[in-house]
A protein has these predicted regions:
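Active-site loop/oxyanion-hole signature of alpha/beta-hydrolase fold enzymes
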Residues: 6, 23-77, 92-93, 238-243
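Active-site glycine-rich loops that stabilize anionic/oxyanionic intermediates
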Residues: 14-17, 80
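Conserved hydrolase catalytic core segment
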Residues: 73-111
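Catalytic histidine neighborhood in serine/cysteine hydrolases
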Residues: 206, 210-229
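Catalytic histidine-centered segment of alpha/beta-hydrolase-like enzymes
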Residues: 227-240
Length: 252
């Protein structure tokens, strides 16, 4: 069996991140899977001539990239905004989704409070720049007990964040603010869904996720204490094992 015929797992990063966030996470993955990572539009090295940052445009880009790699179906493992992209992808290309991991992500749209917060963040970026924004944005995404313990990882994310173009930061914030409710995608899902949830997540609360667990036909969940919005660093071994076990279910 050649590597290209192995079951495909596609990892999608979040806002202000890049494909590099998955490097450590995927290093000890078992053989027998084809692991793919992408830079979403405007992120990492994928920064040239981007005009549309919407979740739908990102989903079309993902579909195009999978087709170029001759991937007909994949398990999507998606952090935060990557999950919003994956839900838009699953809405349009359900036949290409073997399974879905919502890694600190949600099918709900922004609340009014969250939308107002996006506007404040955009205003801050326009006035003070991306570098200043990332200095204050990333730290609270870790659970309080992990903020100093995982200093190296925090600085790694801040470096990626600072390198993200201002147009991307503004475009992605606007796109996330305007994304629709996609709970119907979960309700109609013919594929299994794994929710990975941090109990200390300030971006996606446990309370908002619990009702979503009941929506898919087959739902799995990992709820983690002392974890914020960055479980792939905060509980790397546990979350990696959860994804490996889930891949076994999806492709078993």
């Amino acid at each position: 069996m050649t590597a290209s015929s192995f079951p495909a797992i596609l990892f999608l990063h979040g806002f202000g991140e890049s494909r590099e966030v998955w490097t450590e996470f995927t290093r000890d993955f078992p053989d027998g899977y084809r692991l793919l990572t992408l830079n979403l539009l405007g992120h990492g090295t994928n920064v040239h001539d981007i005009r549309d940052y919407s979740m739908e445009a990102q989903a079309r880009y993902v579909a195009e990239q999978l087709r170029q790699r001759n991937v007909e179906r994949a398990l999507l493992v998606c952090h935060s905004m990557g999950g919003y992209v994956a839900l838009a992808f699953a809405e349009r290309y359900p036949e290409m989704v073997a399974g879905l991991v919502l890694f600190h992500s949600t099918a709900l749209p922004d609340s009014d409070e969250k939308r107002a917060n996006r506007d404040k963040n955009m205003d801050f970026v326009r006035r003070h720049g991306v570098e200043k924004f990332m200095e204050s944005f990333i730290r609270p995404l870790f659970a309080p007990s992990n903020r100093e313990r995982l200093l190296e990882q925090r600085e790694f994310l801040e470096d990626i964040g600072r390198a993200t173009p201002q147009a991307t930061v503004l475009g992605a914030l606007e796109a996330m603010k305007n994304r629709p409710d996609r709970t119907e995608v979960l309700r109609r899902a013919k594929f299994p869904v794994l929710f990975i949830v941090g109990k200390e997540d300030v971006a996606v609360s446990v309370e908002s996720i619990l009702p979503q667990l009941a929506l898919p036909a087959q739902s799995h969940a990992l709820l983690l204490s002392d974890v914020g919005h960055l479980g792939y660093f905060e509980e790397a071994d546990l979350t990696r094992q959860a994804v490996v076990d889930f891949a076994g279910i999806v492709f078993g």
